[in-house]
Amino acid sequence: MEYTKSIAECIKAIEVVNCFGNDKSLINSVEYDSRKVRAYSYDDKTGLKKGAAFFALPGIHTDGKKFINSAIENGAVCIFYEGDLNNHSCDEICFVQVNDVRKTMSKVSALLYDEPSRTLGVIGVTGTEGKSSTVSFIFQLLNLCGKKAGFFSTVEYSIDGNVIPNPEHQTTPESNVVQLRLAQMRDSGCSYAVVEASSHGLSPKTARLEDVIFDAGVFMNVTQEHLEFHGTIEQYRYDKANLFRALDKNPGKGFPIFGIVNYEDPSAPYFMEATQKNVYPFSTELKDLKKIEEYKGLFAKDIEESSSGIKFTLCDFSSRKEYGCELKLAGIFNVKNILASVLAVQRITGLDIACIIEKLPLVKPVKGRMMLIDEGQDFEVLIDYAHTPSSFMTIFPSIKERIKKSGGKVISLFGSGGERDVKKRPEQGRIAALYSDIVILADEDPRGEDSVELLEMIAAGCPEKKRGEELFIIPDRPSAIKKAFSLAGKNDAVLLLGKGHENSIIFKDRTMPYDEETTARKLLIGADCTNP
């Protein structure tokens, strides 16, 4: 389906500093990458030229204004920019100067696609960890309960029932993609949209979610992460809470408006106070029981994990009933993700919670999240996206305890993202050393940093590990995984952490296609992994 809006119509909806050139054309797409601008054409009904609006976004490494000529050559009919514009003039093109080009791109994108979030029940999920799994679980439960939904997350997205791997490294895409995907969900008959709302996406610096009308906000947790972007943990938390502040701006669309918080996290009260709407908590800790009862939330008790999955009892303080629950998922932490998901689906649809709970055994794990790889080897291989100290503490203790009981050892392999928060690196090393018998450090996404220097910063956190026996630095990830498998024996566990679902490794001068699952499986069966 093609969407079009006149340039004049778009200009009326935004704050304009200056405008010159031809404003009679039609906009049929919004782009910030000049390479994606396609040749203009002419509208059959009006005869007017129609093409892309190019937004010259300011960036850390470059400025979008450098690509204006390229966008025009490729067929853009309108250029939006901020600041001064040098050596650009073309009578056939409309130039629009604005104060904030990112916010303007969000506004124009929403307008172009007829504000899709106005007709969808939109659930946003934020948190340092657990976002992608919770988004997927909400999406799955909605569809299992007969409520057509779409979603997008770090891992994958769906607009029409088909789940597609996310081609980007961004958790929350730029606003033009956000609005397009929401429009595609609406047009394919979806009633609900589940959105992974990262702190970057919720920050006014990016305005990626600026014009999304949220009906529900789900908060999972806040731990130290992305400080290279937010500056402080306080600002990081503040930006995440923008999801809950957005609930108060909802004009009312016929869906319930509410928040959900993980009451185990110390920041839960902060998020509850960020909105005037009802907020429902969940927890697995006895100390929170009174608060969960007071706010009519969900509580999980009698949690047991085995090789076949997880069992627990769910206490619903809204109906004051208890339900036995079964999950075919690994990782006790997934109980909290499921509590958030059940609560979100029940509150936004009004369905009987028992109908939702009976679908839980059908919920599937997310790619790259506690994924068990079995090629007949006598040791366990788990792939997980864990890449922060807090996520390490979520997965390591229970795995260590379980493997220790069987007499095995834990071998962990991971790295850390280049050009990102450096403070977490030695802490990653410390936690891994505490729970692992062998630590192997390998590339994650070194970007512009030297691989060995980066990995040595992690190694500084585990000085007690003997080099060459208990600690290895092997930048090439396939080679590092091969080493890990060579050291593994019966009843051992090899944890491949940090890449999860991602489809590449980013270096300074190149991006290498890479899939952790494919690489692991090839190495387990003895295949060549030179080009995984």
UniProtKB/Swiss-Prot annotation:
Keyword Nucleotide-binding: yes
Name this protein carries in UniProt: UDP-N-acetylmuramyl-tripeptide synthetase
Primary role: Catalyzes the addition of an amino acid to the nucleotide precursor UDP-N-acetylmuramoyl-L-alanyl-D-glutamate (UMAG) in the biosynthesis of bacterial cell-wall peptidoglycan.
Subcellular location, record wording: Cytoplasm
Pathway: Cell wall biogenesis; peptidoglycan biosynthesis
Sites of N6-carboxylysine modification: K240
The species this protein was found in: Treponema denticola (strain ATCC 35405 / DSM 14222 / CIP 103919 / JCM 8153 / KCTC 15104)
Domain of life, per lineage: Bacteria
